Amino acid sequence: MRSFASDNNSGVHPLVMEALNRANRDHAVGYGDDVWTEEAVRKIREAFTPDCEPLFVFNGTGSNAVALQLCTRPYNSVICAETAHIYVDECGAPARMTGCQIRPVATPDGKLTPELVRPYLCHFGEQHHSQPGAFYISQCTELGTVYRPDEIRALTELAHRHGMYVHMDGARVANACAALNLSFRQSTVDCGIDILSFGGTKNGLMLGESVIIFNPALKKEACFVRKQSAQLASKLRYLSCQFTAYLTDDLWLKNASHANRMAQLLYAGLKELPGVRFMQKVESNQLFLTMPRPVIDNLLKDYFFYFWNEEENEIRFVTSFDTTEQDIEELLRAIRRYCH
């Protein structure tokens, strides 16, 4: 039975597996000096901008840590939503590796706004205080909501006026682009993002991310920071070749659009049920909702999913590129049975 706990629980797309098998047929130079990585870099530059610098890394936490090290110095602070992955779910790795203070901002929907962050833009030049160095935003957010381009531009313009950078955690950026009908470039480069953690494991890849640097000022030390952060793979082609498959014939878009559609199908079946209340707009492939506790307890006997706020009986469902309509129908059938 399929899990609705996380898109990390999904499998690997067959076309990505084919790419891995092709990369495995012969020897190749290590550490990224291979034809597979060369092609992946070309595809990323084609999708984003010709002058970006992609660095392939092992995972999301490593990607965020590398990106934030490039954006900051140890006396800086990183401003993020209180639900941010770097603040809640990365065991303090970004704080430890950057030396920075992570400053969480209370938000109703997981999004930063200029109004919310302005109180944190203070004490510039005062030696007793951490100096604001970067905004960290997630696209999609940890609450499944999606930033519109104008919302991102408002943050990047504010940051740049204060000599700061903006790092986007794009673990689910494909779902956001699919939801908004935008290209990767329109959602990042054109909005003024300085550096992106470009993920794919939630959308059909096996492992790995790419730190994509857009701001030229951040490129010079990038390869050294990646190596020192233990994020340089010797057989790097097994990370990079997946991105070639991902960016060929819009595989990323097909996968993300499907996951989003499955979330909307689940939402349509749940919204009218007694005792069900949605806590956030369903804009991507994540659903946050409350149900009566007996319904949740019974459902947990058959399905794997997470509590988001156990005191409030709030749970999270996540759909994936390989979620089927039958999976949704079976889940809805079980919920209806327990709701009545």
Locations of the language-model features?
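Conserved PLP-enzyme active-site core in the AAT-like
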Residues: R2-T290, P294-D302, W308-T323, D327, ...
